[in-house]
Structures are given as structure tokens and as C-alpha cells.
Amino acid sequence: MVYLKNFLELGISETFNHTLRENGITEATPIQEKAIPVILSGKDIIGQAKTGTGKTLAFVLPILEKIDPECSDVQALIVAPTRELALQITTEIKKMLVQREDINVLAIYGGQDVAQQLRKLKGNTHIVVATPGRLLDHIRRETIDLSNLSTIVLDEADQMLYFGFLYDIEDILDETPGSKQTMLFSATMPKDIKKLAKRYMDEPQMIQVQSEEVTVDTIEQRVIETTDRAKPDALRFVMDRDQPFLAVIFCRTKVRASKLYDNLKGLGYNCAELHGDIPQAKRERVMKSFREAKIQYLIATDVAARGLDVDGVTHVFNYDIPEDVESYIHRIGRTGRAGGSGLAITFVAAKDEKHLEEIEKTLGAPIQREIIEQPKIKRVDENGKPVPKPAPKKSGQNRQRDSREGSRSDSRRDSRNSSRSDSRNSSRNSSRNENNRSFNKPSNKKGSTKQGQQRRGR
């Protein structure tokens, strides 16, 4: 894809251009090219763009250009549906502030120390990036002052609607000045999002990035046809074969993600899980380790991976196929970032064909199939050493032989017992003690041993 303009032409100052070049960014993406001039003009905008189009910088750069560092009030508010996305946006802003230490940004979200948040909010904070719940909590406590707010961004608005944050967003907007600039970014435009825009935005300019402008050309896509039962073995086979540098493994639910994590961790894979049941502090540690390549495999749900943007992800594994095309595009977009190449492999069972057909129809081409025939999986213990195979059970022939041998033993034993009885009857006048020592006792021991052997044999 060829981008026509650099950031200087779009109105971004040399200070931020220098920082962009230091980060390897020299040309604007379509959403950046279209949105930045409009945002700099102060107009409200609705940006319809999918993940991976560069929309974060599309609103971050003009916001930074308009911040007055001499004013200590909160001037820009960015609302995101998840903690992970809020942290991702905050990280992007901090990257741009290397040469502008006079501008301060603060992320506030659930799971943090409230007292620490209060101390920072009382300081010199120009930009706040927040999740709806914690932000509304601060508004109701009157611990955040939005009276001088000039800009608000609702990022991934459709996801906030999906998570049930619509009323929270309305309450937040009601607490902001009417003269502010409002920006709304969303991959899709449900009716409730349109109603929200109509109520709270002032003649917004619509900016769209058409689907053909969102490219997955640098991502190789494959489908592996399997069954639910064989899927774990198929996944491990591909992991061992491809040896990814960093990989994200997507599961449909938290339960399935946790189960797969236990399975892979028990087999010695360097992996971690990321989903809603993981405490926030641990989630942040996991993401930090993954970004630093200390964790090779990240097993995640769609919700937890929202906004996940990590350099060096070479593989995406759709352990469970996503149920809609938007989620598929978002998932595979975790690899092939910044123009790099990547590989996305989707494991498909017979029941998943309907979802696969929908994805292929949207992409406009079939995805390459790959068949794995009975992968050989090595079983290892907790130390990585091979576990020996259990001894095979006896065949039917062996059991029949044991049965015949048992019958013969029983027959011989009965014959000996009969002979012994006759001998005792014919020699009652003889010394019984001697007979018992010489005949009966050894025979009883021998018979008992034989019976024990036969029981064990059977």
C-alpha cells in the first residue's frame, strides 16, 4: 500500500515528526491522512476504521499538538473499553512525548490503587486515558475535574456498546463541557452508536477507511482441518514444527483458554494466559513479559486481546475459529504489524465450516488448506524427559493360554488331592505325623502356592 502524504504536510510539527522518524514512521496511513487535518481544524469526527489501520496516532498526534502545557487542567480525555487498550494508547502517547516532557498523561482503570490515582489527578495532568467504569467513579467522587476539557475521544465505541457501557458513556458525556471537540472511532456502526453520535456530536464529519484499504497482504493465512478431539495435538504439532518467535493463541472462552494453558504449561511450553479472570496486576505483568519476549506463547480471548499491539509477533493461531469476520481480521492483525510479515493459522472442525465460509466470502478468496495426518506427539514429564509407554495388555491368545494352563493345573491338583486322600485311607495305622511331614504339609504348601499363582495369572 502506498501512502501519499507525510506528517509535516498534514500539519504535525517537526518535534513530533522527529519522534515519528525515530520510531520508523515516515508516512501516514489512510485514516491518519484523512483524520488529522479535520481534527486539527477542531471539528467533531466519526472515524470508521478497523484495528491495525493506525487510528490511534490519527487522534493522538493532533491532540498533542493542541495541548497547552502551561494549563494544568485535564484538556483531553480518551475513553477505551478495556484496560489493555487504555494502557496501549497511553504507551503510544508516551512514545510521542520523548521530546515533550512538559505534557503529562495518566491512565486510570479498575484494579489500580485509588489513592495513587487521586494523588496523580491532583497533579499536573493534561491527558487522561480511562476505562468507563473507573472514570465514572472518579466523576461521582468529584476527584477529577473536566470543566476545562477541550477534547474527548471514544475509542472502539462498538466494543464499549458490546460490554454494556452505553449508559456509562452517556453519563460521562453529560459531565463534559458542551463546547468540547468530540471524536468517535468504531470498526462498525450499530444503531445505538449512531444515536449516541446524533445526540452528543455537533455536525460530525464522517471519515471511513474502506475494507480494501485494510490489507492483510503481508499475512499468510492457512486453515488446518481437524476435529475438536485432535485439535490439541494438531496445535502442538504446528508449534513444534514452526517454532514461532512470538505467537498469540486465540480461544473462544475463558474456560477454554485456561484449559489449553494448563495443557501446554504442563508439557513444558513457555506460555501464559490472558483473559478476564486473570487479576489486573498479573495481566500487566504478562503483557510486559510478552512484549519483552520472555513469554513465547500468549493464550488469549478476544476481549482480553483488544488493543494488543506487540512487535515481533510472527504467528497467530486461531485455536477456536472466531464467529464473525471482524474478530478474524482483528485476530490475524496481531501479526504482520508495521508492514512486517506474519502467519495466521486457523483450526477448523466440521461444525466451523459456516464461519469459515463467511470469512472467505468477505476476504474474496479461499484460504489455503493444510492437512495434518495423525501428528506424533512426544509425552514428557515435568522435567521434559520422555514418559515410557505403558506395558501393553495381554492379547486374547495369552488369556486363552493362561486359561488352559489354569485348567490343567486344577486337573492335576484334583488328581493329586484324590491320590492323597486314598493314601490316607489305606495307611491309617501308619504314623500320621510322619505322613503329614512327608506328604500332606508339602502338598498343602505347594497347592496353596499354585492357587496364588493361578489367581495372579488370571
UniProtKB/Swiss-Prot annotation:
PROSITE patterns: HELICASE_ATP_BIND_1, HELICASE_CTER, Q_MOTIF. The keyword ATP-binding applies. Residues 374-458 are annotated as: Disordered. Transmembrane segments: none annotated. ATP binds at A49, K50, T51, G52, T53, G54, K55, T56. It comes from the Bacteria. SMART domains: DEXDc, HELICc. GO terms for molecular function: ATP binding; ATP hydrolysis activity; RNA helicase activity; RNA strand annealing activity. Residues 36-207 form the Helicase ATP-binding domain. One of its GO terms (biological process) is response to cold. Residues 218-379 form the Helicase C-terminal domain. A motif (DEAD box) lies at residues 155-158. Induction: Induced at 10 degrees Celsius. Its EC number is 3.6.4.13. GO terms for cellular component: cytosol. Keywords: ATP-binding, Helicase, Hydrolase, Nucleotide-binding. It is an enzyme of class 3 (hydrolase). Residues 443-458 have a biased composition (Basic residues). DEAD-box RNA helicase. Probably has an RNA-dependent ATPase activity and a 3' to 5' RNA helicase activity that uses the energy of ATP hydrolysis to destabilize and unwind short RNA duplexes. This is DEAD-box ATP-dependent RNA helicase CshE. It comes from Bacillus cereus (strain ATCC 14579 / DSM 31 / CCUG 7414 / JCM 2152 / NBRC 15305 / NCIMB 9373 / NCTC 2599 / NRRL B-3711).
